[in-house]
Amino acid sequence: MTYALFLLSVILVMGFVGFSSKPSPIYGGLVLIISGAVGCAVILNCGGGYMGLMVFLIYLGGMMVVFGYTTAMAIEEYPEAWGSGVEVLVSVLVGLVMEVGLVLWVKEYDGVVVVVNFNSVGSWMIYEGEGSGLIREDPIGAGALYDYGRWLVVVTGWTLFVGVYVVIEIARGN
């Protein structure tokens, strides 16, 4: 189970390296959709069945619409792939070498530690017994998103609105 999560995380980062190397919008959209699907698999592997399904449906559904529109607007006769230009190829290779180096370093020195600790987990308990508590990940994760991360939800919604407005203005030609 740990190796599956580790492999999914490596594939996720390699997908982001492939996207950040700025290939043609066709290939960039494809890699971002694949990375989103792998990210949903990471969420499913960590026990968030409901959250993984919602992210898959909402995120990837929206991404397919946006990248379908982007691909139609930015169609190229000869799209730039990862091996077609020296700059793109070098950036992908540098990213992959850094990722492989990080994987080997983590495997050799066992340098993975927990970065985030929750201080008030007691308020998230669904059932508390004698010295133990039951936490269900799915409803607690959605509840924590809308309770403790309410400003993050507002900022995310505003960012999506501004992004749609910018795309509409660019498509209009102003």
UniProtKB/Swiss-Prot annotation:
Superkingdom of origin organism: Eukaryota
Entry GO CC: mitochondrial inner membrane
Main location: mitochondrion
UniProt subunit comment: Core subunit of respiratory chain NADH dehydrogenase (Complex I) which is composed of 45 different subunits.
Role, per record: Core subunit of the mitochondrial membrane respiratory chain NADH dehydrogenase (Complex I) which catalyzes electron transfer from NADH through the respiratory chain, using ubiquinone as an electron acceptor. Essential for the catalytic activity and assembly of complex I.
Family: Belongs to the complex I subunit 6 family.
Name this protein carries in UniProt: NADH-ubiquinone oxidoreductase chain 6
Lineage: Eukaryota, Metazoa, Chordata, Craniata, Vertebrata
